[in-house]
């Protein structure tokens, strides 16, 4: 792979400036609807990365770009989403990859879904959608969707590759989040996720080296969803000399917008006259989402303000919500797992405050959705969360892993803040920073740069 160093970047900028003023039409101009983008993601709908990839596809199509999405798990009849097909083969890839992880964990379920090997996957280079695309845009491609060999074939095809990082996996050996480990900077090894903390030449080291070899086979542009993840990624020896920039995920502000709170509660059969604290997660028992800190914060808040037992409740959106009943000091209203966007919007609009005490996170879609609906958010000062929540302006940023400060923030939003000002500021920030057009224009700059570099190389 030919890395993009500063000299090359300057050359590309000159080339782009020349094209901007040269009086002829080229096939990668920002306003040229012939640009074709293929976004590759494991699932169409399941998980935050799938939601973000779908929203980016819609944002690009609404901006005049022809964008399609290639997925393993197709769940709708959307004609802009294409399935890999061969369902039995795809399931085999998933099962084999999971078995290999399980084997290397000595058949322990600890960290089973915190590790990916990319040792099996599908060759997509023969698909018509791949051949038609000007740019291949990788999103979250783990759990048997693409192998490292698949990625190598994509790079060897000569097509420019843009890769949106929803976590650290593309820049590390095998982990999605480093949990304070920085061994990924220089080759991994002695991985804390492996039994006995691995060895100097363990699985994490071997996969890191394989990635290093694969990444040399073509040109890639990495995009992170948060500035925090960009800083983490730039530390990796895998991405040394490769372009890494930060562009947030988009959101459709015509769907996620403020609605009448009482009407939303009626539709969801939630109490109309209680203050509602909302907690959302695909799997609410996921330790990374900080449920233990949430439970502790609620206990502390209710102990200090016992009147909240009568006027406040907790709505929980996500799987396994029923497991939390009896563990919280306030009444719990499980909503379950919901995929319909309008119903999710109603859930946010029913809430008075949204709490996400994640211990490590990128740029959570859930905070963006809540803010778009005018709901102030409370979260820890971790990952990309402080980039979204402006402390005491549109929400509250609590000290990391501090249940007392989390409790203080929730109570402040509910009882001490200028709630209307917080709500309006939350909506305003989303419209300024995360609208479809704003994000699409930033990605068009990356696509144009990638295509200009390809043409310059020719």
Predicted region positions:
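Nucleotide-activated donor-binding/catalytic signature segment of Leloir-type glycosyltransferases, i.e.
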Residues: 305-312, 318-345
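Conserved acidic donor-binding segment of nucleotide-sugar-dependent glycosyltransferases
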Residues: 391-392, 396-403, 412-417
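Aromatic "clamp/platform" in nucleotide-sugar-dependent glycosyltransferases that forms part
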Residues: 359
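Short hydrophobic beta-strand element within catalytic cores of glycosyltransferases
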Residues: 376-379
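Short alpha-helical donor nucleotide-sugar binding micro-motif in glycosyltransferases
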Residues: 346-351
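Conserved donor-binding/catalytic core segment of Leloir-type glycosyltransferases
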Residues: 271-289, 295-298
């Amino acid at each position: 792979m030919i890395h993009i160093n500063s000299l090359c970047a300057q050359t590309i900028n000159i080339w782009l400036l020349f094209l901007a003023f040269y009086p002829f039409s080229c096939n990668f101009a920002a306003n040229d609807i012939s640009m074709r983008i293929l976004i590759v993601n494991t699932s169409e709908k399941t998980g935050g990365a799938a939601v973000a990839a779908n929203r980016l596809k819609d944002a690009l199509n609404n901006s005049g770009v022809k964008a399609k999405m290639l997925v393993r798990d197709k769940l709708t009849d959307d004609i802009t989403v294409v399935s890999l097909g061969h369902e039995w083969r795809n399931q085999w890839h998933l099962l084999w990859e999971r078995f290999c992880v399980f084997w290397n964990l000595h058949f322990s379920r600890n960290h089973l879904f915190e590790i990916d090997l990319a040792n099996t996957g599908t060759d997509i280079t023969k698909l018509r959608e791949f051949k038609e695309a000007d740019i291949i845009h990788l999103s979250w491609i783990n759990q048997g969707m693409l192998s490292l060999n698949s990625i190598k074939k994509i790079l060897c095809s000569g097509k420019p590759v843009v890769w949106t990082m929803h976590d650290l996996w593309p820049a590390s050996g095998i982990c999605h989040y480093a949990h304070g480990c920085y061994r990924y900077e220089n080759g991994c090894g002695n991985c804390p996720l492996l039994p006995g903390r691995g060895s100097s030449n363990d699985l994490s080291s071997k996969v890191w080296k394989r990635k290093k070899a694969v990444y040399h086979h073509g040109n890639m542009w990495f995009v992170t969803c948060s500035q925090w993840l960009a800083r983490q990624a730039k530390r990796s020896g895998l991405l040394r000399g490769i372009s890494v920039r930060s562009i947030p995920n988009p959101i459709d502000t015509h769907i996620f917008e403020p609605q009448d709170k009482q009407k939303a509660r009626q539709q969801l059969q939630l109490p109309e006259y209680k203050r509602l604290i909302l907690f959302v997660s695909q799997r609410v028992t996921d330790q990374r989402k900080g449920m233990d800190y949430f439970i502790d914060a609620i206990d502390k808040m209710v102990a200090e303000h016992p009147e909240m037992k009568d006027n406040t409740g907790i709505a929980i959106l996500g799987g396994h919500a029923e497991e939390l009943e009896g563990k919280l000091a306030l009444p719990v209203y499980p909503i379950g797992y919901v995929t319909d966007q309008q119903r999710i919007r109603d859930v946010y609009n029913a809430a008075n405050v949204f709490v996400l005490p994640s211990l490590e996170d990128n740029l959570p879609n859930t905070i963006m959705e809540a803010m778009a609906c005018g709901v102030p958010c409370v979260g820890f000062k971790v990952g990309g969360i402080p980039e979204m929540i402006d402390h005491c302006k549109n929400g509250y940023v609590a000290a990391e892993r501090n249940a007392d400060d989390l409790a203080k923030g929730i109570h402040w939003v509910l009882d001490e803040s200028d709630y209307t000002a917080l709500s309006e500021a939350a909506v305003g920030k989303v419209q300024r920073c995360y609208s479809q057009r704003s994000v699409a224009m930033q990605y068009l700059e990356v696509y144009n740069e990638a295509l200009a570099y390809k043409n310059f190389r020719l």
